[in-house]
Amino acid sequence: MNNNYPLFWINEILTNGFVEYILDIFSIMAFLTGIYVILTKNPIVSVLFLILLFGGISSYLNIIGLNFIGLSYIIVYIGAVSILFLFILMLINIRTSELQSNTSNSIPLTIFIGIIFSNFLFPMLPYDIVMLSNFYNNYFSEDFYTIDVNINDNNLNNLYNNVLYFMTSVIWDGSVIDFNHITAIGNIMYTIYNIWLIIASFILLLAMVGSIVITIKQRKI
């Protein structure tokens, strides 16, 4: 009896060592909260669902390894834009806006957009990493490495159908403090596209000064 079995090493970073179904949970969470953002009549509750939507998207991005973009979602959208919307909506007469709003007509459009988005997004991601073994010889040979291991090894206890699958990746909580993405983006912005960064800064400065000038009341002569 041959005790040597093929072990497939999948060079994969999309799940950061997590079970891939966690990505499905965050996808469903983001989809449902996005629907409630549209269907909720109370604007404040709608903004709270929007914060949950951005939180789910940020968690999804952190899990798949896009830590800089995921943290940017938390800082920019949740920390600034959503809270600003929440403060603005607190100054609005909510009862009047609730009487004038009718969001039931948006349900078919919401479902249609969700289906179209899912059809475009899901083919881009590995829905099931284990299913890749059925056709890795043809399409994913560069991502797989075959290693012969001995079945009597005490460290190998999770065999399924004589094949052991495991993924190598970076643990996501360690990637949160990893500055590779930030270093790469900063290097590009401050070296290659430095002139565009300066132009964008001047545009932002002009917008701030212009808004202050417009709001200042001119003194009556």
UniProtKB/Swiss-Prot annotation:
It is an enzyme of class 7 (translocase). One of its GO terms (molecular function) is NADH dehydrogenase (ubiquinone) activity. Pfam families: Oxidored_q3. Coiled coil: none annotated. It is found in: Mitochondrion membrane. It catalyses: a ubiquinone + NADH + 5 H(+)(in) = a ubiquinol + NAD(+) + 4 H(+)(out). InterPro entries: NADH_UbQ/plastoQ_OxRdtase_su6, Nuo/plastoQ_OxRdtase_6_NuoJ. It comes from the Eukaryota. The keyword RNA-binding does not apply. GO terms for cellular component: mitochondrial membrane. Keywords: Electron transport, Membrane, Mitochondrion, NAD, Respiratory chain, Translocase, Transmembrane, Transmembrane helix, Transport, Ubiquinone. Its EC number is 7.1.1.2. Its main location: mitochondrion. It is a multi-pass membrane protein. The chain crosses the membrane at residues 18-38, 44-64, 74-94, 107-127, 195-215. Belongs to the complex I subunit 6 family. Core subunit of the mitochondrial membrane respiratory chain NADH dehydrogenase (Complex I) that is believed to belong to the minimal assembly required for catalysis. Complex I functions in the transfer of electrons from NADH to the respiratory chain. The immediate electron acceptor for the enzyme is believed to be ubiquinone. This is NADH-ubiquinone oxidoreductase chain 6. It comes from Podospora anserina (strain S / ATCC MYA-4624 / DSM 980 / FGSC 10383) (Pleurage anserina).
